Design a protein with these regions (language model features):
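N-terminal leader/propeptide and maturation segments of large enzyme subunits in energy/redox metabolism
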Residues: 68-74, 232-270, 346-392
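Glycine-rich phosphate/diphosphate-binding loops that line cofactor/substrate pockets in enzymes
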Residues: 80-100, 155-163, 253, 274-287, ...
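A glycine-rich, hydrophobic/aromatic-adjacent loop/helix-cap motif
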Residues: 281-403
């Protein structure tokens, strides 16, 4: 029996486990790693069932190629690489470099994403995107527009230091149990947990305050809340002056969101909004958290920006226990965003950034001209490009049959 340490592949928390593997290669026991700083010996029920993923290959893993009769047969790796390379070259010679595209996922390792992006984008000059664009584009755009860089500014430890935690459109008790365990470890007896969600979720049940807004009214609530904080002077003027830009523009914009109208649009009473504003004001370390309820919602990017702006104008960022914090879903969605070479340069940065382009080219030891000069076509356009008259009922198998190589 040997013990192999590895990372859970179910969600973005990335818990570590000790897998007890017998001589036949089967996992007999799964135990969360006690000395790993992320899960600290805890896990959810999904992690405890990782042994159910056991896959034993009796024969060497070889590529399969479809024969003319429609059946698959094994071929060698060398032959598979040659067939693939030859077909890609013929397609690009006939239709141009952008006729090639790849689709990836947040389930890949960062190194695999980087390699796919290196080959597909740098050397083949094609398009490529991941399904992480479909779920996380809201947060990506909001962070880039607010900070100039896509990087959620938090660690799980912040949950143990916050005295006010506001969860917007997320249900961590179910979706991110280990993240919620850090809330439970917070020893501040006066801490406040607030949930903004139309649903009375499991997290809402456990919250000190549940704000059951009407669907599509997040942005109205957040702008009204921001206006209240500004009017009452419950903002960090020094931080705003030293660390932000165009606060006056935001201030003038949210003036249009009168608290006397808030109940009509959101279903939340004036008194409750004032109470929330006061809780934020009195909190020394306020953190705001969101996930798919915002990212897949109405006016999603603006909603995420409003969350970030509330954190900025109250000075709740850049300190332990604070932050405007987007929670990802897939186990390596963040790796896809940073290292896939699809919407920006490796490690972050725009394709138009001359200094960054030069630095990346030197690291990769390639000609700078090989680096893309613009972002890829997005996931949906790649799929739509297979069939210009695509409609919602078109089956993916029908689309695949239209491809010269799939």
């Amino acid at each position: 029996m040997k013990v192999v340490r590895s990372t859970c592949n179910y969600c973005s928390i990335a818990c570590n486990f000790d897998f007890h593997v017998n001589d036949n290669g089967f996992i007999e026991r799964v135990k969360p790693s006690e000395d790993y700083p992320v899960n600290q010996g805890f896990c959810c029920v999904k992690g405890l069932n990782l042994d159910k993923q056991n896959t034993i290959y009796e024969n060497p893993v070889l590529p399969l190629i479809r024969k003319e009769n429609g059946e698959f047969e094994h071929i060698s790796w060398d032959e598979a690489f040659k067939v693939f390379a030859d077909k890609v070259k013929k397609i690009q010679d006939k239709y141009g470099k952008e006729s090639f595209a790849f689709l990836s996922t947040g389930q890949l390792l960062s190194e695999e994403m980087a390699l796919a992006g290196h080959i597909g984008r740098n050397f083949l000059g094609g398009n490529g995107d991941g399904n992480t664009r479909l779920c996380m584009a809201t947060a990506v755009v909001a962070y880039k527009q607010s900070f100039g860089f896509d990087a959620p500014p938090y660690t799980l430890d912040d949950l143990e230091h916050s005295d006010v935690m506001i969860f917007i459109g997320c249900n961590p008790i179910v979706a991110h149990p280990i993240l919620w365990s850090r809330v439970a470890k917070n020893e501040n007896k006066n801490k406040k947990v607030i949930v903004i969600d139309p649903r009375k979720s499991e997290t809402a049940v456990r919250a000190d305050m549940w704000i059951d807004i009407k669907p599509k009214s997040d942005i109205r609530l957040l702008y009204t809340l921001a206006n209240v904080l500004i009017e009452k002077g419950w903002i960090d003027e020094e931080f705003i002056k030293n660390s932000t830009e165009d606060f006056e523009g935001f201030k003038n914009h949210v003036k249009n969101y009168d608290i006397n109208d808030v109940e009509e649009y959101t279903g939340i009473s004036k008194g409750k909004v004032l109470e929330l504003a006061e809780i934020i004001h009195k909190g020394e370390k306020v953190s705001l958290w969101w996930t798919m309820g915002v990212n897949q919602g109405f006016q999603a990017v603006r909603t995420a920006q409003a969350i970030i702006n509330i954190a900025l104008m109250t000075g709740n960022i850049g300190r332990p226990g604070t932050g405007a914090n987007s929670i990802t879903g897939q186990c390596n969605a963040m790796g896809s965003r940073i290292f896939s070479n699809t919407t920006g340069l490796y490690g972050g940065g725009e394709y138009s950034d001359v200094k960054r382009r030069k630095a990346i080219a030197e690291i990769l030891e390639i000609d700078e001209e090989l680096l893309p000069k613009k972002p890829t076509k997005p996931y949906n356009e790649i799929v739509d490009g297979i069939n210009k008259v695509l409609n919602g009922t078109t089956n993916m198998n029908e689309l695949n049959n239209k491809l010269a190589l799939y």
